């Protein structure tokens, strides 16, 4: 077996075989409410259809998530005055605070990992990530 296959096997067994609490938290951010909050924070108001496309989810799933976020006071839905079939979703101040908290939590988690790796390994990791993305 070549080093590439061995490295791949080792990486995958660590990623998928040992689900850490942090990994679970980070994967939550890739779907559900955290994703919608971050998407609206980055991109501004969007329609549910745009959010579904960005999330690669059904509009029904997005509608359920939007209802939950609306109940929490984190988003508003407004009908487009020029076309009443279109609904624009925006973050409220509470939603923006949640987005900032999510970003800060992610920063802290990643910085903790980097502190455990040390400066040299962190710089190597970042250089490799930049090179291959």
Question: What are the functions of these language-model segments?
Answer:
Residues 1-31:
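N-terminal leader segment of winged-helix/HTH proteins
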Residues 5, 9-12, 37, 92, ...:
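Generic structural concept
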Residues 15-22, 43, 72, 98:
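A short secondary-structure junction motif
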Residues 20-61:
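N-terminal helix-turn-helix DNA-binding core of bacterial DNA-binding proteins
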Residues 38-42, 103, 130:
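Short, locally clustered residues in the helix-turn-helix/winged-helix DNA-binding domain
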Residues 65:
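Residues in the recognition helix of alpha-helical DNA-binding motifs
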Residues 68-127:
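Charged, amphipathic alpha-helical coiled-coil/dimerization segments
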